[in-house]
């Protein structure tokens, strides 16, 4: 046999030599010189003959049938080894190859990585295409640079690669990695540059099929250059991954804040219920305590009056129950002694009875508080679970998502009905449970498990040809997952189940027949919860379990594919090997180990089932493959207990009968004799009153003073009682104890049941030994305790119960630590253990070198992990870069510290950090800090957490210019220091929730802020939002729980409008529709807040002018209007107003400028058109339709715009409404402005002048640049005060209906369409006219017009902007005299009636010709002016018309007025002017009336 093996080895070696070009015969000579051997595809079944090649450096064996590695003992210089596709099953025999650098073992059957411990120089290792399940055995390979483990069976990475810090290339494609958490382990490989998880040559890992896979990898491994063979070295790609993750962290942080807010709201509800439950005990304690102190006061009076012996023991506290009496004064008579003794005994007996009742109610109160604390604890645990859900969502980048259901969700109702149907009250009767109340249902969306579930089911169905879709559905079931009943449901276990799937129960410690290797589920609530309740009930009997633990529970509902299922056999353990080709087994309820199985028959026949499905089979299911189970719902519930059921009665469940019985016992105790008469209350103290109460003659005699039960709030001159040793001031109204200061002999002070809020001013009580401060309103425990430590150094007994402490949990320990002289606290003796514990806590209240070594970390890079905790806390939990407390430390060890976490260390001050110059992340939450100090040298600090302290100011942060994140929740901040925020130029995250902040003024320069959390503060004014308008980077704002939300109805839209960059407000994303609604509501809205923002204060009464030109204002809301009572001028030109809006409420406004707006009316008009005629509607649609408002019926106008409308803005005198597009004056309702004096309406589209009848005081009216065609009868009829009227640039053809405006002095009608000279006559009805403009009309082309008007209108002083001088007037009169001499000789008429020849009915045309006129009599008319011959027959038809004119004389032609008439009639015929004359006239400048905004014209009346 041995010879055969040698023969085979020889043949193998010969084949080896042949394949490598070597001679077998010369192998001994040539072998040492050979460095490389190669064997491909058979011919080398085992590793033989390698000893002939001691200097071999490369060995390549491919496609052989080698099962083990051997024969390398002499290959000490081997550097590269290939054994691939060789059926190799184990790694061995490499320990002699210490110089090996490259090892290729791919395509084999290796299942374990082993035998590589000595390969310290190995740089390349390929183990792909094997059967490896676990990454292991690589710890010693610190030089490894390339590792290929593709196409194996690896499920997890863990910490197995942490030692391989030089690893640059890693290929894990084709494995079973399904969790993002596993990939985060690769972030600890600092040199990793090339990673493969779904290499195209292999199938992808399940994790690669999840959303955001690449984003997750690139964020955690930023140095990566290639991912899955793709180049990812571009900075843009890394930035995209970074920004995506940052946004997700912001999003989940916001949701975490939402959870915390909901938690606070729920806790507040619990506190309200607790407060209600405490009312009865507290009221009873107060009433009973008041009576006890009255009786004790009576005892003191009896003693002081000499009616009883001295040294009678008086009990002053609840725990003192000494009811013995002493004998009466021997000096009194026996009868007197007996009466006094009886009364004394009655008083003591009643005091004892009342104190017993006080003890009872105190115990009740403690039970309520204990129940409250337990309820709060369980509620916090519930919300903490939601926080963990969010953390899981973030870590899985949304591939595991939790959706909290509401009644509106269809799945919520289905799940709810399922739970109710699977709950049978009969099954829970033994535990005192009558029902179930569901608090929360959370739906689990696990994309990872769902993919596994679907793949597994699909694979099963592919191998089961007989199964159809319908049969598949029948195999699906929703079942309850059963946790270990002996352990409470741990959050980690619950999260593990929801994220990674259900665990297979392995009960190997049980007897063989009871062993289970499967996932345990059930379709019954009783089978799911029964074992847990039984276990808790047993513990409750032993008093080792809180009865409240019964009430709350959590269940997981999973979708289960049962596959092939059979009934469990009694004789076989439930293991996969015992049930071949079976996916699940079930066992009916009778097999379950439950104490209530005997009730089964009763259950099935009971009528108390309600809607439960207990008639169905209740059984347990055991599923062998956990991938057939998909957790879908998490349900939090509470059991409803039966009345008076043991283990479930809580203080809040007590019925009215019990309370009535307890109250009756109180009344019985109160009814005991003696009955004390009520004493008159003392409201203020004076010397007489003090002496009377103390029953003394002088102050020096007073040692005891009892002022119990009065209405005192001050103790005037109490310091004069130098001998006072005991003072009782309970049941008064003191808010401070400053008045009792410097009572140097005072030993006993009872100030219970008052309103004391602080001990500030409490001084000079060096002998005080007893102090009762219970039932007050103290809040700051440490501050008040330090006052007592300083000013009451001998204090031995202190009662501080029932105050409003900010941190009640630490009050007792702080009190014992701060006041070392105390022996009794809250009526209980302080034990040595309590003193020791308090001193231990106190000793740790300073930052020492030891605490720094324990809590510091030295990481140089911020942790790249998806976690919502502060960076310092993340490093404290996960980082291993700690300082060694046992090592010898040099002076430079301080500079290595980059992270420090000192949470819950009872710190009072931040000290000893001067040397931490490289500190970047720090957390000091849950301490007793009152100010920020000691951080001045930590200039590199980037994150700072100061939550849960007592800090009131941000002082001490100014030098932290690199600070990026600041959290200061649950403190006492009242605002922000502008200089501090300005110095924090890189701050982008600020959380200051649960403080006392009322102003945001200091945040105006926090330009880099992205996230701002300010919930539960005291912000109440909208104006505070303006302080944030400059924060253009602000994306998330949370102000929930501030008064501003309740005070302002449209708060949300208001904030969205003013902070345009915001994406989420109060935990809710801002929708595009909300942005539109905000613009509609607040766009262009002038409010008090806007004005305050501009002027910098809210002293609106100082304002006289408001100038908001060109501000895009659409509405005005200045409330309260009385604050603007001194405003007289408002300029809102160039805005978007459609009405006067809120301006009508300004009481004293005089000048209003609204040019260039869109004013439609004084008040907003209704949109309805029901009152309009068809013509009016058509005109509104098409302004050129020509119908205008002429179709408006008189009745309709009177109804809508008539005089019945009440006056508004009665102080307004000047109104500018130019260029508003106004087409209807009645719609403006200007008649309501009764005291208006100047009205400017230029540049509109007005075609009819109406609706001004009520403006009786109007003096100036401007209507130029409109579309007025005619003057109606009523246009100016009642404007009797009108002084100036401007109608220029309109379409007037005549001046009909122009009323006799007696006061009108200025009329501008230029640039209209007036053609007829006859229209000039109509101006004569205006007697006071001083200024007239008529240029730009067709009539103005007539050359005689100016002379005519000058002569005709004798009072006229300015015409077309040119002053009329005396010379002008004389020239005009001369002209008409000459005109008369010209026209009279040419007239064909009778001398007896000369005037008739000058009266014509037809126009006498004048024409310009080139024919010169002989003579010079008419030089003033121009050399080229001639009359047409057409005048010869102008009198033929007029003779009869004027026959009645008989009384004229021959000299009538010399009358100036008649001369003007003659000239006027001649001008009616028309005149043609020569070009030279027109040129001359056009050269004359005519001033045009303009109407710009001018403060000088505000109250002008011409």
Swiss-Prot record:
Listed InterPro entries: Leu-rich_rpt, Leu-rich_rpt_4, Leu-rich_rpt_typical-subtyp, LRR_dom_sf, SDS22/Internalin_LRR
GO cellular component: cytoplasm
Annotated region (Disordered), positions in chain: 317-342, 1479-1502
LRR repeats: 53-79, 97-119, 120-141, 142-164, 166-188, 224-247, 296-320, 699-721, 722-744, 746-764, 765-790, 792-814, 822-849, 894-916, 917-938, 939-960, 961-983, 985-1009, 1011-1030, 1031-1053, 1100-1123, 1124-1146, 1147-1170, 1209-1232, 1234-1255, 1256-1278, 1280-1301, 1302-1325, 1327-1351
Keyword Repeat: yes
Stored PROSITE patterns: LRR
Entry keyword set: Leucine-rich repeat, Repeat
Bilayer-crossing regions: none
Pfam families linked to this entry: LRR_4, LRR_8, LRR_9
UniProt biased composition (Polar residues): 1479-1496
Signal peptide, first to last residue: none
Protein name in UniProt: Leucine-rich repeat-containing protein 9
Gene: lrrc9
């Amino acid at each position: 046999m041995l010879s055969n093996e040698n023969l085979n080895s020889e043949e193998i070696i010969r084949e080896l030599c042949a394949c490598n070009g070597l001679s077998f015969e010369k192998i001994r000579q040539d072998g040492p010189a050979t460095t490389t051997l190669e064997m491909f595809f058979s011919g080398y079944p085992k590793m033989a003959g390698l000893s002939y090649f001691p200097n071999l450096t490369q060995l390549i064996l491919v496609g052989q049938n080698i099962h083990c590695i051997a024969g390398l003992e002499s290959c000490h210089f081997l550097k590269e080894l290939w054994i691939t596709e060789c059926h190799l099953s184990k790694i061995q025999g490499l320990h002699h190859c210490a110089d090996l650098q490259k090892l290729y073992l791919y395509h084999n059957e290796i299942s374990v990585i082993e035998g590589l411990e000595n390969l310290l120089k190995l740089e390349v290792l390929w183990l792909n295409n094997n059967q490896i399940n676990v990454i292991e055995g690589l710890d010693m390979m610190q030089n490894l640079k390339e590792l290929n483990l593709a196409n194996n069976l690896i499920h997890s990475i863990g910490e197995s690669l942490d030692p391989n810090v030089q690893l640059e290339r890693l290929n894990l494609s084709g494995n079973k990695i399904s969790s993002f958490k596993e990939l985060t382990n690769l972030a600890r490989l600092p040199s990793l540059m090339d990673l493969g998880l779904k290499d195209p040559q292999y199938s992808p890992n399940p994790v690669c099929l999840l959303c955001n896979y690449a984003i997750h990898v690139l964020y955690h491994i930023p140095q990566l250059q290639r991912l899955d063979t793709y180049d990812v070295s571009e900075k843009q790609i890394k930035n995209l991954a970074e920004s995506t993750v940052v946004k997700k962290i912001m999003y989940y942080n916001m949701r975490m804040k939402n959870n915390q807010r909901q938690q606070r709201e729920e806790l507040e509800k619990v506190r309200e219920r607790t407060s209600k439950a405490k009312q009865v005990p507290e009221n009873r304690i107060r009433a009973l305590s008041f009576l006890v102190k009255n009786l004790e006061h009576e005892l003191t009076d009896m003693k002081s009056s000499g009616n009883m012996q001295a040294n009678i023991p008086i009990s002053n506290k609840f725990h003192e129950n000494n009811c013995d009496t002493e004998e009466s004064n021997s000096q009194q008579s026996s009868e007197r002694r007996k009466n006094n003794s009886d009364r004394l005994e009655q008083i003591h007996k009643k005091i004892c009875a009342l104190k017993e009742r006080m003890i009872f109610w105190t115990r009740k109160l403690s039970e309520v508080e204990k129940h409250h604390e337990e309820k709060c604890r369980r509620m916090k645990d519930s919300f903490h679970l939601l926080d963990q859900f969010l953390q899981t969502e973030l870590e899985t980048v949304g591939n595991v998502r939790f959706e909290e259901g509401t009644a509106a969700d269809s799945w919520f109702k289905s799940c709810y009905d399922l739970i109710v149907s699977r709950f049978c009250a009969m099954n829970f009767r033994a535990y005192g449970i009558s029902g179930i109340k569901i608090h929360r249902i959370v739906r689990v969306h696990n994309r990872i498990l769902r993919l596994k579930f679907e793949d597994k089911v699909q694979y099963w169905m592919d191998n089961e040809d007989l199964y159809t879709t319908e049969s598949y559905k029948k195999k699906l079931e929703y079942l309850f997952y059963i946790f270990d009943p002996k352990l409470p449901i741990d959050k980690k276990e619950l999260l593990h189940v929801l994220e990674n799937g259900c665990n297979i129960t392995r009960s190997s410690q049980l007897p063989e027949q009871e062993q289970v290797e499967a996932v345990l589920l059930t379709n019954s609530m009783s089978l799911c919860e029964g074992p847990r309740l039984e276990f808790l009930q047993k513990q409750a009997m032993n008093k080792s379990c809180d009865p409240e633990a019964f009430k709350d529970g959590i269940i997981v509902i999973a979708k289960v594919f049962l596959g092939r299922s059979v009934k469990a056999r009694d004789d076989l353990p439930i293991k996969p090997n015992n049930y071949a080709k079976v996916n699940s087994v079930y066992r009916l309820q009778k097999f379950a180990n439950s104490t209530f199985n005997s009730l089964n028959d009763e259950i099935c026949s009971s009528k108390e089932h309600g809607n439960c499905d207990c008639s169905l089979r209740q059984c347990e299911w055991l599923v062998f493959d956990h991938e057939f189970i998909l957790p879908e719902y998490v349900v939090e519930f509470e059991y409803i207990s039966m009345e008076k059921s043991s283990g479930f009665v809580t203080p809040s469940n007590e019925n009215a009968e019990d309370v009535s019985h307890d109250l009756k016992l109180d009344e019985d105790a109160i009814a005991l004799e003696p009955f004390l008469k009520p004493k008159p209350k003392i409201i203020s103290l004076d010397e007489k009153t003090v002496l009377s109460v103390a029953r003394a003659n002088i102050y020096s005699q007073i040692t005891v003073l009892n002022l119990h039960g009065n209405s005192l709030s001050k103790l005037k001159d109490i310091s004069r009682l130098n001998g006072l040793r005991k003072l009782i001031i309970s049941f008064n109204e003191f808010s401070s104890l400053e008045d009792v200061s410097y009572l140097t002999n005072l030993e006993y002070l009872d100030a219970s049941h008052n309103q004391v809020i602080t001990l500030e001013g409490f001084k000079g009580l060096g002998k005080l030994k007893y102090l009762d401060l219970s039932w007050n309103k103290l809040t700051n425990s440490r501050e008040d305790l330090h006052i007592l430590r300083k000013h009451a150094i001998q204090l031995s007994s202190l009662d501080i119960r029932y105050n409003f402490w900010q941190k009640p949990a630490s009050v007792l320990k702080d009190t014992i630590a701060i006041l070392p002289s105390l022996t009794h606290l809250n009526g209980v003796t302080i034990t040595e253990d309590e003193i020791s514990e308090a001193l231990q806590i106190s000793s740790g209240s300073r930052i020492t070198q030891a605490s720094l070594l324990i809590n510091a970390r030295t990481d140089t890079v911020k942790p790249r992990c998806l976690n919502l905790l502060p960076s310092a806390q993340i490093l404290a939990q996960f980082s291993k870069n700690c300082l060694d407390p046992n090592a010898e430390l040099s002076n430079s060890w301080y500079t290595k510290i980059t992270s420090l976490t000192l949470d819950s260390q009872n710190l009072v001050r931040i000290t000893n950090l001067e040397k931490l110059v490289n500190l970047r992340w720090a957390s000091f939450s849950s301490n007793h800090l009152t100010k920020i100090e000691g951080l001045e040298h930590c200039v590199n600090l980037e994150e700072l957490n100061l939550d849960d302290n007592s800090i009131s100011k941000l002082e001490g942060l100014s030098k932290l210019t690199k600070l990026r994140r600041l959290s200061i929740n649950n403190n006492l901040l009242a605002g922000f220091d502008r200089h501090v925020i300005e110095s924090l130029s890189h701050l982008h995250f600020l959380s200051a929730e649960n403080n006392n902040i009322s102003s945001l003024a200091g945040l105006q320069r926090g330009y880099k802020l992205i996230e701002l959390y300010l919930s539960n503060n005291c912000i109440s004014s909208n104006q505070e939002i303006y302080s944030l308008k400059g924060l253009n980077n602000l994306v998330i704002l949370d102000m929930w729980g501030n008064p501003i939300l309740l005070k302002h109805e449209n708060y949300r839209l208001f904030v969205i409008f003013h902070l345009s960059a915001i994406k989420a407000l109060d935990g809710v994303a801002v929708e595009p529709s909300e942005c539109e609604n905000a613009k509609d509501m607040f766009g262009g809205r002038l409010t008090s807040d806007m004005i305050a923002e501009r002027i910098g204060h809210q002293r609106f009464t100082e304002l006289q002018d408001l100038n908001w030109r060109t501000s895009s204002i659409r509405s005005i809301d200045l409330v309260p209007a009385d604050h603007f009572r001194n405003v007289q001028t408002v300029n809102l030109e160039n805005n978007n107003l459609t009405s006067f809006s809120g301006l009508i409420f300004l009481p004293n406004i005089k000048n209003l400028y609204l040019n260039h707006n869109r004013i439609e009316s004084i008040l907003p008009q209704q949109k309805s058109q029901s009152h309009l005629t068809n013509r009016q509607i058509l005109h509104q649609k098409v302004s050129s339709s020509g119908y205008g408002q002429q179709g408006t019926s008189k009745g309709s106008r009177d109804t809508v715009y008539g005089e019945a409308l009440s006056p508004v803005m009665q102080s307004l005198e000047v109104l500018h409404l130019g260029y508003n597009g106004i087409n209807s004056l009645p719609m403006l309702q200007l008649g309501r402005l009764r005291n208006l004096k100047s009205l400017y309406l230029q540049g509109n589209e007005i075609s009819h002048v109406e609706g001004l009848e009520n403006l009786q005081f109007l003096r100036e009216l401007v209507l130029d640049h409109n579309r007025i065609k005619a003057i109606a009868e009523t246009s100016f009829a009642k404007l009797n005060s009108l002084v100036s009227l401007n109608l220029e640039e309109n379409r007037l053809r005549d001046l009909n209906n122009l009323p006799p405006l007696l006061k009108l002095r200025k009329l501008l009608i230029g640039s209209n369409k007036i053609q007829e000279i006859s229209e000039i006559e109509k101006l004569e009805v205006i007697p006071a006219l001083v200024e007239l403009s008529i240029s730009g009309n067709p009539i103005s082309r007539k050359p005689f017009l100016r002379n005519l008007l000058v002569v005709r209108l004798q009072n006229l002083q300015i015409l077309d902007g040119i002053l009329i001088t005396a010379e002008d007037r004389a020239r005009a009169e001369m002209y008409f005299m000459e005109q008369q001499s010209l026209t009279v000789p040419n007239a064909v008429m009778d001398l007896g009636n000369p005037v008739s020849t000058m009266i014509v009915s037809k126009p006498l045309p004048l024409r310009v010709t080139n024919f010169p006129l002989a003579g010079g009599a008419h030089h003033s008319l121009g050399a080229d002016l001639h009359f047409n011959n057409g005048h010869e027959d102008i009198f033929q038809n007029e003779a009869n018309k004027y026959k009645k004119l008989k009384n004229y004389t021959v000299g009538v032609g010399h009358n100036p007025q008649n001369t003007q008439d003659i000239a006027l009639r001649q001008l009616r015929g028309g005149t043609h002017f020569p070009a030279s004359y027109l040129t001359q006239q056009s050269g004359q400048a005519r001033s045009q009336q303009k109407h710009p905004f001018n403060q000088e014209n505000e109250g002008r009346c011409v």
